UniProtKB/Swiss-Prot annotation:
Sequence segments annotated as region (Disordered): 239-384, 398-430
Name of the featured protein: BSD domain-containing protein 1
Native source organism of the sequence: Bos taurus (Bovine)
Biased composition, class Acidic residues, residue ranges: 250-259
Keyword Phosphoprotein attached: yes
Biological classification of the source: Eukaryota, Metazoa, Chordata, Craniata, Vertebrata
Modified residues (Phosphoserine): S123, S197, S418, S419, S449
Domain called BSD: residue spans: 177-229
This protein's encoding gene: BSDC1
Length: 461
Protein backbone atom coordinates (compact mmCIF):
# COMPACT_ATOMS: atom_id res chain seq x y z
CA UNK A 1 0.00 0.00 0.00
CA UNK A 2 2.76 2.29 0.79
CA UNK A 3 4.61 1.87 -2.39
CA UNK A 4 1.41 2.39 -4.24
CA UNK A 5 0.70 5.41 -2.24
CA UNK A 6 4.07 6.75 -2.85
CA UNK A 7 3.61 6.22 -6.47
CA UNK A 8 0.34 8.10 -6.47
CA UNK A 9 1.91 10.99 -4.71
CA UNK A 10 4.69 11.00 -7.16
CA UNK A 11 2.19 11.06 -9.97
CA UNK A 12 0.39 13.98 -8.40
CA UNK A 13 3.60 15.84 -7.82
CA UNK A 14 4.60 15.08 -11.30
CA UNK A 15 1.30 16.52 -12.48
CA UNK A 16 1.63 19.61 -10.36
CA UNK A 17 5.16 20.34 -11.22
CA UNK A 18 6.21 23.20 -13.38
CA UNK A 19 4.77 23.04 -16.86
CA UNK A 20 6.53 23.74 -20.03
CA UNK A 21 8.25 27.14 -20.29
CA UNK A 22 6.03 28.66 -23.05
CA UNK A 23 2.74 27.78 -21.45
CA UNK A 24 3.79 29.14 -18.04
CA UNK A 25 4.60 32.64 -19.37
CA UNK A 26 1.26 33.03 -21.11
CA UNK A 27 -0.69 32.06 -18.01
CA UNK A 28 1.07 34.58 -15.82
CA UNK A 29 0.43 37.43 -18.30
CA UNK A 30 -3.23 36.67 -18.34
CA UNK A 31 -3.47 36.66 -14.58
CA UNK A 32 -1.65 39.98 -14.32
CA UNK A 33 -3.89 41.67 -16.89
CA UNK A 34 -7.02 40.44 -15.13
CA UNK A 35 -5.78 41.81 -11.83
CA UNK A 36 -5.12 45.24 -13.44
CA UNK A 37 -8.61 45.36 -14.96
CA UNK A 38 -10.17 44.57 -11.62
CA UNK A 39 -8.16 47.32 -9.90
CA UNK A 40 -9.15 49.94 -12.49
CA UNK A 41 -12.82 49.12 -12.29
CA UNK A 42 -12.66 49.21 -8.52
CA UNK A 43 -11.00 52.66 -8.49
CA UNK A 44 -13.49 54.03 -11.04
CA UNK A 45 -16.42 52.78 -9.00
CA UNK A 46 -14.97 54.28 -5.85
CA UNK A 47 -14.46 57.67 -7.56
CA UNK A 48 -17.96 57.65 -9.01
CA UNK A 49 -19.44 56.72 -5.67
CA UNK A 50 -17.50 59.47 -3.96
CA UNK A 51 -18.62 62.09 -6.53
CA UNK A 52 -22.24 60.97 -6.26
CA UNK A 53 -21.99 61.06 -2.51
CA UNK A 54 -20.59 64.60 -2.49
CA UNK A 55 -23.20 65.91 -4.90
CA UNK A 56 -25.94 64.19 -2.98
CA UNK A 57 -24.72 65.70 0.25
CA UNK A 58 -24.64 69.19 -1.31
CA UNK A 59 -28.13 68.76 -2.73
CA UNK A 60 -29.31 67.49 0.61
CA UNK A 61 -27.83 70.48 2.39
CA UNK A 62 -29.53 72.86 -0.05
CA UNK A 63 -32.83 71.07 0.48
CA UNK A 64 -32.42 71.21 4.23
CA UNK A 65 -31.62 74.91 4.08
CA UNK A 66 -34.60 75.66 1.84
CA UNK A 67 -36.89 73.64 4.06
CA UNK A 68 -35.60 75.45 7.12
CA UNK A 69 -36.16 78.85 5.55
CA UNK A 70 -39.58 77.84 4.32
CA UNK A 71 -40.49 76.56 7.77
CA UNK A 72 -39.34 79.78 9.39
CA UNK A 73 -41.28 81.91 6.92
CA UNK A 74 -44.41 79.84 7.40
CA UNK A 75 -44.09 79.98 11.15
CA UNK A 76 -43.50 83.70 11.13
CA UNK A 77 -46.38 84.39 8.76
CA UNK A 78 -48.63 82.13 10.76
CA UNK A 79 -47.68 83.83 13.99
CA UNK A 80 -48.26 87.27 12.48
CA UNK A 81 -51.63 86.18 11.08
CA UNK A 82 -52.71 84.69 14.40
CA UNK A 83 -51.54 87.76 16.28
CA UNK A 84 -53.33 90.10 13.87
CA UNK A 85 -56.51 88.05 14.07
CA UNK A 86 -56.33 87.97 17.83
CA UNK A 87 -55.79 91.72 17.97
CA UNK A 88 -58.76 92.39 15.70
CA UNK A 89 -61.04 90.06 17.64
CA UNK A 90 -59.86 91.55 20.90
CA UNK A 91 -60.59 95.06 19.69
CA UNK A 92 -64.04 94.06 18.50
CA UNK A 93 -64.83 92.35 21.76
CA UNK A 94 -63.71 95.32 23.81
CA UNK A 95 -65.69 97.78 21.71
CA UNK A 96 -68.94 95.89 21.83
CA UNK A 97 -70.72 96.42 25.11
CA UNK A 98 -72.60 93.58 26.78
CA UNK A 99 -73.82 92.54 30.22
CA UNK A 100 -74.08 89.46 32.43
CA UNK A 101 -72.61 86.11 31.53
CA UNK A 102 -72.00 87.17 27.95
CA UNK A 103 -69.75 89.96 29.14
CA UNK A 104 -67.76 87.60 31.40
CA UNK A 105 -67.34 85.10 28.59
CA UNK A 106 -66.18 87.76 26.20
CA UNK A 107 -63.78 89.11 28.79
CA UNK A 108 -62.22 85.70 29.33
CA UNK A 109 -61.95 85.14 25.60
CA UNK A 110 -60.44 88.59 25.19
CA UNK A 111 -57.81 87.86 27.86
CA UNK A 112 -56.97 84.55 26.22
CA UNK A 113 -56.58 86.16 22.80
CA UNK A 114 -54.49 88.93 24.35
CA UNK A 115 -52.08 86.36 25.77
CA UNK A 116 -51.81 84.71 22.34
CA UNK A 117 -51.22 88.08 20.67
CA UNK A 118 -48.47 89.02 23.13
CA UNK A 119 -46.85 85.63 22.72
CA UNK A 120 -46.69 85.52 18.93
CA UNK A 121 -46.40 89.25 18.14
CA UNK A 122 -43.51 91.15 19.78
CA UNK A 123 -44.04 94.63 21.14
CA UNK A 124 -43.40 97.59 18.77
CA UNK A 125 -40.38 98.80 20.78
CA UNK A 126 -38.63 95.47 20.18
CA UNK A 127 -39.10 95.47 16.41
CA UNK A 128 -36.86 97.24 13.90
CA UNK A 129 -38.07 98.56 10.58
CA UNK A 130 -35.26 97.57 8.22
CA UNK A 131 -36.53 99.95 5.54
CA UNK A 132 -35.98 102.95 7.81
CA UNK A 133 -33.06 102.06 10.07
CA UNK A 134 -29.72 100.90 8.66
CA UNK A 135 -27.43 99.03 11.00
CA UNK A 136 -23.64 99.11 11.00
CA UNK A 137 -21.07 97.02 12.81
CA UNK A 138 -18.92 98.58 15.50
CA UNK A 139 -15.29 97.65 16.23
CA UNK A 140 -16.44 95.92 19.41
CA UNK A 141 -18.55 93.48 17.37
CA UNK A 142 -21.98 94.99 18.10
CA UNK A 143 -24.49 96.61 15.74
CA UNK A 144 -26.02 100.05 16.04
CA UNK A 145 -28.01 102.46 13.81
CA UNK A 146 -25.97 103.94 11.00
CA UNK A 147 -24.43 107.34 11.60
CA UNK A 148 -22.19 109.00 9.02
CA UNK A 149 -19.94 110.63 11.59
CA UNK A 150 -19.45 107.43 13.56
CA UNK A 151 -18.86 105.45 10.36
CA UNK A 152 -16.07 107.82 9.33
CA UNK A 153 -14.62 107.65 12.85
CA UNK A 154 -14.56 103.83 12.78
CA UNK A 155 -12.93 103.89 9.35
CA UNK A 156 -10.31 106.33 10.62
CA UNK A 157 -9.57 104.15 13.66
CA UNK A 158 -9.03 100.99 11.61
CA UNK A 159 -6.84 102.64 8.94
CA UNK A 160 -3.07 102.15 9.51
CA UNK A 161 -2.34 105.31 7.49
CA UNK A 162 -3.86 107.34 10.32
CA UNK A 163 -0.95 106.46 12.57
CA UNK A 164 1.91 105.90 10.08
CA UNK A 165 1.61 108.90 7.73
CA UNK A 166 2.12 112.55 8.50
CA UNK A 167 -1.08 114.55 9.14
CA UNK A 168 -2.86 116.06 6.15
CA UNK A 169 -2.83 119.80 5.58
CA UNK A 170 -0.24 122.48 6.26
CA UNK A 171 2.32 121.62 8.96
CA UNK A 172 1.69 125.02 10.56
CA UNK A 173 -1.85 124.01 11.48
CA UNK A 174 -0.63 120.76 13.01
CA UNK A 175 2.03 122.59 15.01
CA UNK A 176 -0.50 125.15 16.24
CA UNK A 177 -2.89 122.39 17.31
CA UNK A 178 -0.07 120.42 18.93
CA UNK A 179 0.97 123.44 21.00
CA UNK A 180 -2.50 123.49 22.59
CA UNK A 181 -2.92 119.70 22.93
CA UNK A 182 -2.00 117.88 26.13
CA UNK A 183 -1.59 114.11 25.90
CA UNK A 184 -1.70 113.67 29.68
CA UNK A 185 -5.32 114.83 29.74
CA UNK A 186 -6.31 112.07 27.30
CA UNK A 187 -5.09 109.13 29.38
CA UNK A 188 -8.60 108.08 30.36
CA UNK A 189 -9.86 108.28 26.79
CA UNK A 190 -6.79 106.36 25.54
CA UNK A 191 -7.50 103.57 28.02
CA UNK A 192 -11.14 103.36 26.88
CA UNK A 193 -10.07 103.23 23.24
CA UNK A 194 -7.57 100.44 23.86
CA UNK A 195 -10.16 98.43 25.79
CA UNK A 196 -13.23 99.09 23.63
CA UNK A 197 -11.72 99.15 20.13
CA UNK A 198 -9.97 95.94 19.01
CA UNK A 199 -8.71 97.59 15.81
CA UNK A 200 -6.90 100.38 17.69
CA UNK A 201 -5.53 97.89 20.19
CA UNK A 202 -4.18 95.65 17.40
CA UNK A 203 -2.58 98.55 15.52
CA UNK A 204 -1.07 99.96 18.72
CA UNK A 205 0.44 96.62 19.63
CA UNK A 206 1.85 96.18 16.13
CA UNK A 207 3.23 99.71 15.55
CA UNK A 208 4.38 100.93 18.96
CA UNK A 209 7.32 101.14 19.36
CA UNK A 210 8.41 99.31 16.17
CA UNK A 211 7.16 101.93 13.67
CA UNK A 212 6.12 104.99 15.67
CA UNK A 213 6.42 106.18 19.23
CA UNK A 214 3.61 106.28 21.74
CA UNK A 215 3.22 110.07 21.52
CA UNK A 216 3.31 110.16 17.70
CA UNK A 217 0.69 107.41 17.53
CA UNK A 218 -1.81 109.28 19.67
CA UNK A 219 -0.94 112.75 18.39
CA UNK A 220 -1.75 111.73 14.82
CA UNK A 221 -4.91 109.94 15.89
CA UNK A 222 -6.34 112.82 17.89
CA UNK A 223 -5.39 115.34 15.16
CA UNK A 224 -7.30 113.22 12.63
CA UNK A 225 -10.27 113.23 14.97
CA UNK A 226 -9.96 117.02 15.28
CA UNK A 227 -10.01 117.41 11.47
CA UNK A 228 -13.04 115.12 11.27
CA UNK A 229 -14.92 117.26 13.80
CA UNK A 230 -14.12 120.43 11.86
CA UNK A 231 -15.34 118.86 8.62
CA UNK A 232 -18.55 117.74 10.29
CA UNK A 233 -19.11 121.27 11.65
CA UNK A 234 -18.74 122.70 8.14
CA UNK A 235 -21.22 120.17 6.78
CA UNK A 236 -23.74 121.01 9.48
CA UNK A 237 -23.37 124.74 8.74
CA UNK A 238 -23.89 124.19 5.00
CA UNK A 239 -26.91 121.99 5.66
CA UNK A 240 -28.46 124.56 7.98
CA UNK A 241 -27.85 127.33 5.45
CA UNK A 242 -29.47 125.28 2.69
CA UNK A 243 -32.52 124.58 4.86
CA UNK A 244 -32.88 128.27 5.67
CA UNK A 245 -32.65 129.25 2.00
CA UNK A 246 -35.32 126.68 1.11
CA UNK A 247 -37.61 127.72 3.96
CA UNK A 248 -37.39 131.41 3.08
CA UNK A 249 -39.78 131.98 0.18
CA UNK A 250 -39.01 134.92 -2.12
CA UNK A 251 -41.34 137.86 -1.53
CA UNK A 252 -42.25 138.46 -5.17
CA UNK A 253 -45.89 139.13 -4.31
CA UNK A 254 -44.97 141.82 -1.79
CA UNK A 255 -42.71 143.54 -4.30
CA UNK A 256 -45.47 143.46 -6.92
CA UNK A 257 -47.93 144.98 -4.44
CA UNK A 258 -45.48 147.75 -3.62
CA UNK A 259 -44.95 148.49 -7.30
CA UNK A 260 -48.69 148.45 -7.91
CA UNK A 261 -49.18 150.90 -5.04
CA UNK A 262 -47.08 153.52 -6.83
CA UNK A 263 -49.65 155.09 -9.19
CA UNK A 264 -48.82 157.28 -12.18
CA UNK A 265 -50.43 160.26 -10.44
CA UNK A 266 -47.97 159.97 -7.57
CA UNK A 267 -45.12 159.94 -10.07
CA UNK A 268 -46.47 163.06 -11.70
CA UNK A 269 -46.83 164.77 -8.34
CA UNK A 270 -43.24 163.89 -7.54
CA UNK A 271 -41.95 165.83 -10.53
CA UNK A 272 -40.66 169.30 -9.73
CA UNK A 273 -42.00 171.93 -12.12
CA UNK A 274 -39.44 174.06 -13.94
CA UNK A 275 -39.59 177.66 -12.82
CA UNK A 276 -39.43 180.24 -15.61
CA UNK A 277 -37.75 183.57 -14.93
CA UNK A 278 -39.86 186.65 -15.39
CA UNK A 279 -37.13 188.60 -17.13
CA UNK A 280 -36.66 188.19 -20.85
CA UNK A 281 -33.27 187.34 -22.42
CA UNK A 282 -31.02 190.09 -23.58
CA UNK A 283 -31.72 191.32 -27.07
CA UNK A 284 -35.24 189.88 -27.14
CA UNK A 285 -38.51 191.70 -26.58
CA UNK A 286 -39.81 191.29 -23.03
CA UNK A 287 -43.43 190.99 -21.94
CA UNK A 288 -45.36 194.22 -22.35
CA UNK A 289 -48.32 193.48 -20.05
CA UNK A 290 -49.53 190.98 -17.44
CA UNK A 291 -51.38 189.15 -20.19
CA UNK A 292 -48.15 188.47 -22.02
CA UNK A 293 -46.58 187.20 -18.81
CA UNK A 294 -49.39 184.67 -18.48
CA UNK A 295 -48.56 183.35 -21.93
CA UNK A 296 -45.15 182.07 -20.87
CA UNK A 297 -46.33 180.27 -17.72
CA UNK A 298 -46.66 176.44 -17.72
CA UNK A 299 -49.69 175.50 -19.78
CA UNK A 300 -52.41 173.34 -18.26
CA UNK A 301 -53.61 170.15 -20.05
CA UNK A 302 -55.71 170.68 -23.21
CA UNK A 303 -58.93 169.79 -21.39
CA UNK A 304 -58.65 172.97 -19.30
CA UNK A 305 -58.10 175.37 -22.21
CA UNK A 306 -60.60 178.22 -22.24
CA UNK A 307 -62.72 178.85 -25.35
CA UNK A 308 -60.97 182.23 -25.86
CA UNK A 309 -57.88 180.46 -27.16
CA UNK A 310 -57.79 179.94 -30.91
CA UNK A 311 -57.01 176.68 -32.68
CA UNK A 312 -53.58 178.04 -33.53
CA UNK A 313 -52.61 178.57 -29.89
CA UNK A 314 -53.92 175.14 -28.85
CA UNK A 315 -51.97 173.33 -31.55
CA UNK A 316 -48.89 175.39 -30.70
CA UNK A 317 -49.02 174.48 -27.00
CA UNK A 318 -49.79 170.77 -27.47
CA UNK A 319 -46.93 170.29 -29.93
CA UNK A 320 -44.32 171.27 -27.32
CA UNK A 321 -42.76 168.07 -25.95
CA UNK A 322 -40.33 169.40 -23.37
CA UNK A 323 -40.23 173.15 -22.82
CA UNK A 324 -36.64 174.16 -21.99
CA UNK A 325 -35.69 176.67 -19.32
CA UNK A 326 -35.97 180.29 -20.30
CA UNK A 327 -32.25 180.81 -19.77
CA UNK A 328 -31.41 178.38 -22.61
CA UNK A 329 -33.78 179.93 -25.15
CA UNK A 330 -31.90 182.18 -27.59
CA UNK A 331 -33.08 185.73 -28.12
CA UNK A 332 -35.30 186.28 -31.14
CA UNK A 333 -33.75 188.71 -33.62
CA UNK A 334 -35.56 191.97 -34.15
CA UNK A 335 -35.70 191.58 -37.91
CA UNK A 336 -37.39 188.18 -37.52
CA UNK A 337 -40.06 189.58 -35.19
CA UNK A 338 -40.59 192.46 -37.61
CA UNK A 339 -41.13 190.03 -40.48
CA UNK A 340 -43.62 188.02 -38.43
CA UNK A 341 -45.50 191.23 -37.69
CA UNK A 342 -45.61 192.13 -41.37
CA UNK A 343 -46.89 188.67 -42.30
CA UNK A 344 -49.70 188.87 -39.75
CA UNK A 345 -50.68 192.38 -40.97
CA UNK A 346 -50.85 191.15 -44.56
CA UNK A 347 -53.10 188.30 -43.50
CA UNK A 348 -55.45 190.66 -41.67
CA UNK A 349 -55.62 193.07 -44.62
CA UNK A 350 -56.48 190.20 -46.92
CA UNK A 351 -59.33 189.15 -44.63
CA UNK A 352 -60.71 192.74 -44.56
CA UNK A 353 -60.49 193.20 -48.34
CA UNK A 354 -62.27 189.97 -49.17
CA UNK A 355 -65.20 190.97 -46.89
CA UNK A 356 -65.02 188.05 -44.54
CA UNK A 357 -67.05 188.45 -41.37
CA UNK A 358 -65.28 185.88 -39.19
CA UNK A 359 -62.78 186.85 -36.52
CA UNK A 360 -59.25 187.61 -37.74
CA UNK A 361 -56.60 184.96 -37.11
CA UNK A 362 -54.75 185.30 -33.84
CA UNK A 363 -51.71 183.48 -32.47
CA UNK A 364 -53.03 183.54 -28.88
CA UNK A 365 -56.34 184.42 -27.23
CA UNK A 366 -56.97 187.78 -25.66
CA UNK A 367 -57.52 187.79 -21.91
CA UNK A 368 -60.77 189.40 -20.69
CA UNK A 369 -59.23 191.62 -18.01
CA UNK A 370 -59.11 195.34 -18.59
CA UNK A 371 -55.34 195.35 -18.20
CA UNK A 372 -55.05 193.19 -21.30
CA UNK A 373 -56.63 195.69 -23.70
CA UNK A 374 -54.33 196.87 -26.49
CA UNK A 375 -52.89 200.28 -25.68
CA UNK A 376 -51.52 201.16 -29.11
CA UNK A 377 -52.48 200.96 -32.75
CA UNK A 378 -50.59 197.68 -33.19
CA UNK A 379 -52.69 194.51 -32.97
CA UNK A 380 -52.18 192.17 -30.06
CA UNK A 381 -51.86 188.77 -31.79
CA UNK A 382 -48.43 189.43 -33.36
CA UNK A 383 -46.98 190.54 -30.03
CA UNK A 384 -48.21 187.40 -28.29
CA UNK A 385 -46.85 185.15 -31.01
CA UNK A 386 -43.51 186.93 -30.77
CA UNK A 387 -43.34 186.48 -26.99
CA UNK A 388 -44.34 182.81 -27.08
CA UNK A 389 -41.87 181.95 -29.84
CA UNK A 390 -39.14 183.62 -27.80
CA UNK A 391 -39.76 181.21 -24.89
CA UNK A 392 -40.21 177.88 -26.73
CA UNK A 393 -38.14 178.31 -29.88
CA UNK A 394 -35.78 175.35 -29.34
CA UNK A 395 -38.47 172.71 -28.73
CA UNK A 396 -41.05 173.88 -31.25
CA UNK A 397 -41.57 171.32 -34.00
CA UNK A 398 -44.54 172.54 -36.03
CA UNK A 399 -45.79 176.11 -36.20
CA UNK A 400 -48.70 176.88 -38.49
CA UNK A 401 -50.48 180.10 -39.20
CA UNK A 402 -54.05 179.22 -40.12
CA UNK A 403 -56.20 181.80 -41.85
CA UNK A 404 -59.98 181.94 -41.84
CA UNK A 405 -60.04 181.06 -45.52
CA UNK A 406 -58.61 177.61 -44.77
CA UNK A 407 -55.12 178.20 -46.28
CA UNK A 408 -52.03 177.29 -44.23
CA UNK A 409 -48.37 178.12 -44.51
CA UNK A 410 -45.58 175.55 -44.83
CA UNK A 411 -44.51 173.85 -41.61
CA UNK A 412 -41.79 175.39 -39.47
CA UNK A 413 -39.13 172.94 -38.24
CA UNK A 414 -37.84 175.18 -35.45
CA UNK A 415 -35.01 176.86 -37.38
CA UNK A 416 -34.48 180.60 -37.26
CA UNK A 417 -34.79 181.03 -41.01
CA UNK A 418 -38.14 179.30 -41.21
CA UNK A 419 -40.14 182.40 -40.22
CA UNK A 420 -38.48 184.34 -43.04
CA UNK A 421 -39.53 181.65 -45.47
CA UNK A 422 -43.10 181.96 -44.17
CA UNK A 423 -43.24 185.67 -44.82
CA UNK A 424 -41.75 185.22 -48.30
CA UNK A 425 -44.32 182.53 -49.13
CA UNK A 426 -47.14 184.81 -48.05
CA UNK A 427 -45.77 187.60 -50.23
CA UNK A 428 -45.55 185.27 -53.21
CA UNK A 429 -49.10 183.94 -52.72
CA UNK A 430 -50.85 187.26 -52.35
CA UNK A 431 -48.42 189.75 -53.96
CA UNK A 432 -49.94 192.72 -52.15
CA UNK A 433 -48.67 196.29 -52.60
CA UNK A 434 -50.05 198.43 -49.81
CA UNK A 435 -49.42 202.04 -49.07
CA UNK A 436 -49.21 203.61 -45.64
CA UNK A 437 -52.76 204.93 -45.86
CA UNK A 438 -54.13 201.47 -46.63
CA UNK A 439 -52.18 200.06 -43.69
CA UNK A 440 -53.64 202.68 -41.32
CA UNK A 441 -57.16 201.93 -42.55
CA UNK A 442 -56.60 198.19 -42.10
CA UNK A 443 -55.36 198.71 -38.56
CA UNK A 444 -58.39 200.79 -37.61
CA UNK A 445 -60.71 198.13 -39.02
CA UNK A 446 -58.84 195.44 -37.13
CA UNK A 447 -59.27 197.33 -33.84
CA UNK A 448 -62.98 197.71 -34.45
CA UNK A 449 -63.41 194.07 -35.40
CA UNK A 450 -61.36 193.03 -32.34
CA UNK A 451 -63.71 194.86 -29.97
CA UNK A 452 -66.73 193.23 -31.62
CA UNK A 453 -65.05 189.87 -31.37
CA UNK A 454 -64.46 190.32 -27.64
CA UNK A 455 -68.14 191.02 -27.13
CA UNK A 456 -69.07 187.94 -29.16
CA UNK A 457 -66.70 185.71 -27.17
CA UNK A 458 -68.10 187.03 -23.88
CA UNK A 459 -71.64 186.31 -25.06
CA UNK A 460 -70.54 182.81 -26.09
CA UNK A 461 -69.05 182.17 -22.65
Amino acid sequence: MEPGGDGAEDDVGAGIGPPAPGWCLRGRCRVGSQREDVGWWRSWLQQSYQAVKEKSSEALEFMKRDLTEFTQVVQRDTACTIAATASVVKEKLTTEGSSGATEKMKKGLSDFLGVISDTFAPSPDKTIDCDVITLMGTPSGTAEPYDGTKARLYSLQSDPATYCNEPDGPPELFDAWLSQFCLEEKKGEISELLVGSPSIRALYTKMVPAAVSHSEFWHRYFYKVHQLEQEQARRDALKQRAEQSISEEPGWEEEEEELAGVSPTSLKEAKVPVARPSTSPEGGPGPQSPCEENLVTPVEPPTEVTPSESSESVSLVTQIAKPPPASEAPALPKDLSQKLLEASLEEQDLAVDTGETGPPPRAQSKPHTPACRPSGPEPRPPARVETLREEILTDLRVFELNSDSGKSTPSNNGKKGSSTDISEDWEKDFDLDMTEEEVQMALSKVDASGELEDVEWEDWD
